[in-house]
Swiss-Prot record:
Its cofactor is FAD. Homodimer. FAD binds at T14, E33, Q41, Y46, V86, F120, D284, S327. Keywords: FAD, Flavoprotein, NADP, Oxidoreductase. It is an enzyme of class 1 (oxidoreductase). Binds 1 FAD per subunit. Its EC number is 1.18.1.2. It comes from the Archaea. This is Ferredoxin--NADP reductase. PANTHER family: THIOREDOXIN REDUCTASE 1-RELATED-RELATED (PTHR48105). It catalyses: 2 reduced [2Fe-2S]-[ferredoxin] + NADP(+) + H(+) = 2 oxidized [2Fe-2S]-[ferredoxin] + NADPH. One of its GO terms (molecular function) is ferredoxin-NADP+ reductase activity.
Length: 331
């Protein structure tokens, strides 16, 4: 068993920044990632997506942002272990025993959960033909817009991901349709405006996809107007379903964590503490009492900073809460 001050679970954006901050505060940490890559949702869901809401960076490709976060996380040589799924956590006295892939490997004085929305799968439309045409014209993510060059594409959804996909696809596709069951979109105002101004994007609102058709690959979809019940057919080369993901917080059988009402997050107080002393959470997994959910990289980063400072005080009560300015360090 190896001993650490802190085990960080998850190497998405929040976990990577927490790794850097732990090094900044001289906290001996190890970061455990279940997947074989870092970055969490970025490489899996939107590697080609431009990111605009990180302080000081007007625009950056998501995968490039991930790479820069990874480089920053390695600044102090704190360990990051991939293919390391935490399968259980046991608290004995003031020490947490961390089980990885079924084997107890690490002891830690504190744990920081940065697991995002946990194990997740794309939310499906639930219509006829959806499973049949998966990877045969139907996809739930856009990892490479070049694969859609000169194709006629429809994107189903009304959130930021759907409209961002549509705008990016318009750069390579012949034409893009956005299909949404309502007239009201959940995306940011500027995201909606950008899509509406694009001549290669057509909005089909108050409508739902009821079937997906084709031969060896997707060729068309049937759309039902929710107001008139009229059914129409739309010829397509590709369909992107972007209506969210079904997530659930990782559950550790020996750790009675208090979950949020929707079971997708862990309840924390204003100090990012869970109901178990020594266990903290930051990022999408953290459901802060009395606050709305803010699934943003910037919010996760701020929470990581706050959590690491509280963890420093937890493992060393004599330490100052604020560790000073990084600009004062020669790193």
């Amino acid at each position: 068993m190896e001993d650490y001050d802190l085990v960080i679970i998850g190497a998405g954006p929040t976990g990577l920044f927490a790794t850097f901050l732990a090094g900044l505060r001289d906290i001996k940490s190890i970061t455990l990632e279940a997947l074989d890559y870092v970055g969490g949702q970025i490489p899996e869901l939107y590697p080609e997506k431009p990111v605009y809401d990180v302080q000081g960076i007007p625009k950056i490709n998501a995968i490039k942002l991930r790479d820069q976060m990874y480089e920053q996380a390695k600044t102090f040589n704190n360990r990051i272990e991939l293919n390391s799924k935490v399968t259980d956590i046991i608290k004995e006295n003031d020490i947490f025993k961390i089980e990885v892939n079924g084997v107890y490997k690490y002891n830690a004085r504190a744990v920081l959960l940065c697991t995002g929305i946990g194990d997740f799968t794309p939310r499906k439309i639930g219509c006829e033909g959806e499973d049949r045409f998966f990877n045969k014209g139907l996809t739930y993510t856009v990892k490479d817009t070049e694969k859609f060059r000169d194709l006629t594409v429809a994107v189903v959804g009304g959130g930021d991901s759907a409209l961002d996909y549509a705008t990016e696809l318009a750069n390579t596709a012949r034409h893009v349709y956005i299909i949404h069951h309502s007239e009201n979109f959940k995306a940011a105002e500027k995201t909606i405006d950008l899509a509406r101004k694009n001549e290669k994007i057509t909005f089909i609102v108050n409508s739902s996809v009821i079937s997906i058709d084709g031969g060896s690959k997707l060729e068309s979809i049937k759309i039902k107007n929710e107001l008139t019940n009229d059914i129409s057919e739309l010829g397509l080369d590709a369909l992107v379903v972007a209506i969210g993901h079904v997530g659930r917080a990782n559950i550790y059988k020996s750790l009675p964590l208090q979950l949020s009402p929707n079971k997708r997050g862990v309840l924390v107080n204003s100090k990012l503490e869970t109901n178990i002393p020594g266990i903290y959470a930051a990022g999408d997994v953290a459901s802060v009492e009395g606050e709305p959910a803010n699934p943003l990289i910037a919010i996760g980063g701020a929470q990581a900073y706050q959590a690491i400072n509280y963890i420093k005080k937890y493992i060393n009560p004599q330490a100052s809460f604020f560790g000073g300015h990084s600009s004062n360090l020669k790193i």
